[in-house]
Amino acid sequence: MNLPKRIFIKTFGCQMNEYDSSRMLDMLQAAEGMQTTDNPEEADVILLNTCSVREKAQEKVFSHLGRFAPLKEKNPDLVIGVGGCVASQEGESIVARAPYVDVVFGPQTLHRLPDMIESKRRTGISQVDISFPEVEKFDHLPPPRVEGAAAFLSIMEGCSKYCTFCVVPYTRGDEVSRPFDDILTEAIQLAEQGVKEITLLGQNVNGYRSETADGEMADLALLIEYLAEIPEIERIRYTTSHPNEMTPALIDCYARIPKLVSHLHLPVQAGSDRVLMNMKRNYTVLQYKSIIRKLRAARPDICISSDFIVGFPGETEQDFEATMKLMRDVGFDFSFSFIYSPRPGTPASYLPDDCSPEEKQSRLSRLQALNEAQGKAISASMVGSIQRVLIESVSAKRADELAGRTDNNRIVNFPGDTALINQFVNVRITEALSHTLRGELV
């Protein structure tokens, strides 16, 4: 009897990549009956799904590939593939530098992966396809297969904002939205498998625009309204959004649709209008704060998290202090902050940068300390409250406890029976720790 082939997938970066990796697995399971393995040494196929947002992304990929080279020498039939945004950037140069790589594919061509693997096996020639065939990939993917009550659902690809620091438009292409009815179909398929919470994904997810079957123009607000009508779907999230796409209709969803969670990740990047202009964000601090005010009017308990870039070229101490002020004024929940690192080929990479690495690190530490204090204060304010929690798994810290997620995206650990996994329960919060909560079933 032939044993099923095994696949090892290493995923870097964002939730879009996590979604794409799950769809790669769906395809190869459908095509070849593959099973996953956590051990690359026993794999028949090794895939790296890469991210190019952070510094030295390419070198990290080649470092991992170098570890797999001896496995290829030992087993010439092993298939090694590189996908994702680094694949889009590097293309043929990946094979030139690492000739043992068999397939290179971009985010928009992952649906061709089974055919590319078959072509490599048949011809012995490495296959490279990093084209941008819009949403063709969604037409060729099998129905999703999920385990657990929470799932990702990709609704659009790419970004057309062209912020000066960002490589995404060059690696994932311009914005392309999936057909409205296709998204509803996938959501229903997920619900039929027991999914209760969906997270809608896109690089600029609230820029979603498509048409319904009757020709009505649909945006993210309308999509959320329709998804909320699926009885089994009890909770809806979306990420990542752009402030300029927070339309009145979308903000109004927070007042009308309880299934839409009381948490929003809304990247601001900086608190200085001058820096925002140089980043080509196309909004001001005042406009951003106005959006937050409207969101809190619609949903008073909403938690707002964000992204911040520290040390952008030309950032002065005054600019940075403006970012600190914005952090305090908005009261951001736990957020992501990074020192600026130039992405090759982006406009910002050509800007003069006279801020020392030491000063950038100092600014980052100050910003993160403030944000940490604010996040902890929000957690502390939840002690004594009763939260609706979707139980996801056994706790990573204690085998006799469960772990779940609140509406506002907090992890809660509490004693409970494993039979409750994938269910919603009410939990009284008893303690706020550094980045998690403790509680008890009500």
Curated annotation (Swiss-Prot):
The entry sums up its family as follows:
Belongs to the methylthiotransferase family. MiaB subfamily.
Name all TRAM domain ranges. Answer: 380-442
Q: What is this protein called?
A: tRNA-2-methylthio-N(6)-dimethylallyladenosine synthase
User: Which organism's genome codes for this protein?
Assistant: Methylobacillus flagellatus (strain ATCC 51484 / DSM 6875 / VKM B-1610 / KT)
Q: Its catalytic activity?
A: N(6)-dimethylallyladenosine(37) in tRNA + (sulfur carrier)-SH + AH2 + 2 S-adenosyl-L-methionine = 2-methylsulfanyl-N(6)-dimethylallyladenosine(37) in tRNA + (sulfur carrier)-H + 5'-deoxyadenosine + L-methionine + A + S-adenosyl-L-homocysteine + 2 H(+)
- EC number(s): the record gives 2.8.4.3
Q: What does this protein do?
A: Catalyzes the methylthiolation of N6-(dimethylallyl)adenosine (i(6)A), leading to the formation of 2-methylthio-N6-(dimethylallyl)adenosine (ms(2)i(6)A) at position 37 in tRNAs that read codons beginning with uridine.
Complex and partners? Monomer.
Assigned GO CC terms: cytosol
The record's listing under Pfam families reads: Radical_SAM, TRAM, UPF0004
Q: Does the keyword Glycoprotein apply?
A: no
Residues covered by the Radical SAM core domain:
145-377
* Molecular function via GO: 4 iron, 4 sulfur cluster binding; metal ion binding; N6-isopentenyladenosine methylthiotransferase activity
Q: Which residues form the MTTase N-terminal domain?
A: 5-122
**Which keywords does UniProt give here?**
4Fe-4S, Cytoplasm, Iron, Iron-sulfur, Metal-binding, S-adenosyl-L-methionine, Transferase, tRNA processing
Task: Tell me the residue numbers annotated for binding [4Fe-4S] cluster 2.
Answer: 159, 163, 166
Query: What Gene3D superfamilies does the annotation carry?
Result: Methylthiotransferase, N-terminal domain, tm_1862 like domain
List locations, semicolon-separated.
Cytoplasm
Q: What is the lineage of its organism?
A: Bacteria, Pseudomonadati, Pseudomonadota, Betaproteobacteria, Nitrosomonadales
Explain how, and how many, cofactor molecules are bound: Binds 2 [4Fe-4S] clusters. One cluster is coordinated with 3 cysteines and an exchangeable S-adenosyl-L-methionine.
Task: List required co-factors.
Answer: [4Fe-4S] cluster
